[in-house]
């Protein structure tokens, strides 16, 4: 029995990146032997064990053979005779098929992963890559993380991904798996690379048709020098990741904010009146299909509906600002206003030439919200108030607080 460190921990160490969890592969053992050493079995589909002291995952070396459609149809062989090289061959990309012998720090790299790391190439290991459609989304997710380091996908890997899409392999993916890859990509520094990669291999229209529909829809060049709405969406996603690193909730809201532009009648192009209202239905549809968590869905709908109001905040009456806060449920969920402000700033800055622009509307919205939030029912003279009168008096007090919080000379945001 011998164990090797494999996968992401080895890859990230070679890239000089912070390593995540350590995963190990065990050669020459069977489940009974692992249990006798105190390892706890946790794998459902194949033999995986937790180390009795460290809690790290140790998986028996295995091979996988396709015997059905989709990503679930595999026969797993975890016999003790399976070699390390055979186990590494079943993995997706060469950079993930590097093992380290911790006893002497020797790298085992049978498929050229070290060279691909040096060349900044994401390359599949074997034709078996095409047997698992989830790997198309994994490739896109890896690009969201690795593109800032200069990585690109090998041409032959892109060709295989396109063929997988053309063969209908991605139609078997369940919504939960799509959401898992999408949400993880939103936690990385360049989520636009996820969208760009999927679109390059014609997969975006299969798994995220609402987003794919944005590409080719023009915006007014005076306000959007990038013109294409899909490109604007990519820019917004990357700015959101910069403003709120690792925040998938904000990332998803930013992703959905302009979905309504895909539904604008062509006769009104490149203008998009009412796109915030039109975007509510596709945002709801996308969220429900992918079974997105409720808090993600709610913030996405808020961002879709309210982003133009935040852009033109200086033009809104005090009572209109209060109504905006109420629609956001901002007095019970105060965190939503700061989140909305970040999404709106990402939208404003997600345009060619505006990436570093100042966005005072966001700070001002938070300031108005804080002023209104500081007023509560206990502050009222309730001696002569009854029933709904209390709520009405509280609303008026909060509107006065908003009025007293000051104004600023902001933009109108009308043409966003």
Swiss-Prot record:
Residues holding CTP: 8, 11, 91, 138, 141
Note on cofactor: Magnesium is required for nucleotidyltransferase activity. Nickel for phosphatase activity.
Any GO BP annotation: tRNA 3'-terminal CCA addition
Residues given in the record as Mg(2+) binding sites: 21, 23
Keywords from the named record: ATP-binding, Hydrolase, Magnesium, Metal-binding, Multifunctional enzyme, Nickel, Nucleotide-binding, Nucleotidyltransferase, RNA repair, RNA-binding, Transferase, tRNA processing
InterPro entries cross-referenced by the UniProt entry: CCA_bact, HD_domain, NT_sf, PolA_pol_head_dom, PolyA_RNA-bd, tRNA_CCA-adding_enzyme
One GO MF term attached to the UniProt entry: CCA tRNA nucleotidyltransferase activity
Cofactor requirements of the protein: Mg(2+); Ni(2+)
Enzyme Commission designation: 2.7.7.72, 3.1.3.-, 3.1.4.-
Domain of life: Bacteria
Misc. comment: A single active site specifically recognizes both ATP and CTP and is responsible for their addition.
Database matches in HAMAP family: CCA_bact_type1 (MF_01261)
Domain notes: Comprises two domains: an N-terminal domain containing the nucleotidyltransferase activity and a C-terminal HD domain associated with both phosphodiesterase and phosphatase activities.
Subunit structure: Monomer. Can also form homodimers and oligomers.
The protein, known as: Multifunctional CCA protein
